[in-house]
C-alpha cells in the first residue's frame, strides 16, 4: 500500500471544481461525523475545548437570512422598501414581494438583518430573520 502525502492531496484538491470540492466536504462530514462549521472556527480551539465548544460555536450564528413572510396591506410601500434594500428593478422587486414567503438577502450580518427587518416592517411587511 502506497502512502499519499499531504502535498499530493493538496494538488488533487486544487485540480477539483468548486462543485466537486463541495461534494468532497459533504462526504468528509458524513464519513468522519464532523461539521465544516466547527473546522472553520479553528481546529485547535475545537480540539482543546472539546465537544462542548464545538456545540457553542455552532449555536452562535453570525450570518442571517432575511425572509419576507408577507407583504401585508401596503404592497406598494413594501415593493419600494425591497427595491431600496436589494437594488432590484421594479418588476423584480414586485415579483419577489408577490412570491412571499421569499428570501430577500442571504448571509448578512446581524446589524444589517435587523436594519432591513425594521425598514420592511415600517412599510407594512412581515419579516423573519433566520
UniProtKB/Swiss-Prot annotation:
Gene3D superfamilies: 3.30.1390.10, Single helix bin
CC terms in the record's Gene Ontology section: cytosolic large ribosomal subunit
Record keywords: Ribonucleoprotein, Ribosomal protein
GO terms, molecular function: mRNA binding; structural constituent of ribosome
Pfam families: Ribosomal_L12, Ribosomal_L12_N
CDD domains for this protein: Ribosomal_L7_L12
Superkingdom per UniProt: Bacteria
InterPro entries named among the record's database cross-references: Ribosomal_bL12 (IPR000206), Ribosomal_bL12_C (IPR013823), Ribosomal_bL12_C/ClpS-like (IPR014719), Ribosomal_bL12_oligo (IPR008932), Ribosomal_bL12_oligo_N_sf (IPR036235)
One of the GO biological process terms: translation
Key word Lipid metabolism present: no
Description of how the protein assembles with itself and partners: Homodimer. Part of the ribosomal stalk of the 50S ribosomal subunit. Forms a multimeric L10(L12)X complex, where L10 forms an elongated spine to which 2 to 4 L12 dimers bind in a sequential fashion. Binds GTP-bound translation factors.
Family, as annotated: Belongs to the bacterial ribosomal protein bL12 family.
Described purpose of this protein according to its UniProt entry: Forms part of the ribosomal stalk which helps the ribosome interact with GTP-bound translation factors. Is thus essential for accurate translation.
Protein name: Large ribosomal subunit protein bL12
Amino acid at each position: 500500500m502506497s502512502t499519499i502525502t499531504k502535498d499530493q492531496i493538496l494538488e488533487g484538491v486544487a485540480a477539483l471544481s468548486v462543485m466537486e470540492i463541495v461534494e468532497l466536504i459533504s462526504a468528509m462530514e458524513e464519513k468522519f461525523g464532523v461539521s465544516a462549521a466547527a473546522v472553520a472556527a479553528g481546529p485547535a480551539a475545537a480540539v482543546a475545548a472539546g465537544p462542548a465548544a464545538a456545540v457553542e460555536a455552532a449555536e452562535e450564528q453570525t450570518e442571517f437570512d432575511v425572509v419576507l413572510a408577507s407583504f401585508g396591506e401596503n404592497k406598494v410601500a413594501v415593493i419600494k422598501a425591497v427595491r431600496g434594500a436589494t437594488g432590484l428593478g421594479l418588476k423584480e422587486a414586485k415579483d419577489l414581494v408577490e412570491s412571499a414567503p421569499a428570501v430577500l438577502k442571504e448571509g448578512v450580518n446581524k446589524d444589517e438583518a435587523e436594519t432591513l427587518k425594521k425598514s420592511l416592517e415600517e412599510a407594512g411587511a412581515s419579516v423573519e430573520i433566520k
